[in-house]
């Protein structure tokens, strides 16, 4: 039983370490904007959407910042795409 608990704890820890953090990005290449800095329901909801897959989100530097994102989620800055330019 103790071994099972240790294995489970290690898997949870590994998942946390391998998760990435970053700003949500719009199709334009800009950060997803927010205005209420700190704890922010909008950013938290956006980060936790199924297609985003984050564990927590808040407003930092007027952009939605997400923690615990899978590697497949794009974060700002996008390579070869400048905010607002084509």
Swiss-Prot record:
Domain notes: Has the structural arrangement of an alpha-helix connected to antiparallel beta-sheets by disulfide bonds (CS-alpha/beta).
Intrachain disulfide bonds: 30-83, 34-59, 43-64, 47-66
InterPro entries: LCN-type_CS_alpha_beta_dom (IPR044062), Scorpion_toxin-like (IPR003614), Scorpion_toxin-like_sf (IPR036574), Scorpion_toxinL (IPR018218), Scorpion_toxinL/defensin (IPR002061)
Tissue note: Expressed by the venom gland.
Keyword Signal tagged: yes
GO annotation terms (biological process): defense response
The keyword Secreted is assigned to this record: yes
Keyword terms, alphabetized: Amidation, Disulfide bond, Ion channel impairing toxin, Neurotoxin, Secreted, Signal, Toxin, Voltage-gated sodium channel impairing toxin
Primary localization: secreted
Organism annotation: Centruroides sculpturatus (Arizona bark scorpion)
Subcellular location: Secreted
Molecular-function GO terms, alphabetical: sodium channel inhibitor activity; toxin activity
Modified residues (Cysteine amide): 83
Signal peptide: 1-19
Protein family (similarity comment): Belongs to the long (4 C-C) scorpion toxin superfamily. Sodium channel inhibitor family. Beta subfamily.
Functional description taken from the UniProt entry: Beta toxins bind voltage-independently at site-4 of sodium channels (Nav) and shift the voltage of activation toward more negative potentials thereby affecting sodium channel activation and promoting spontaneous and repetitive firing. Affects channels from chicken and frog.
Domain of life: Eukaryota
Gene Ontology CC entries for this record: extracellular region
Domain LCN-type CS-alpha/beta, chain residue ranges per copy: 20-84
Protein name, per record: Beta-toxin CsEI
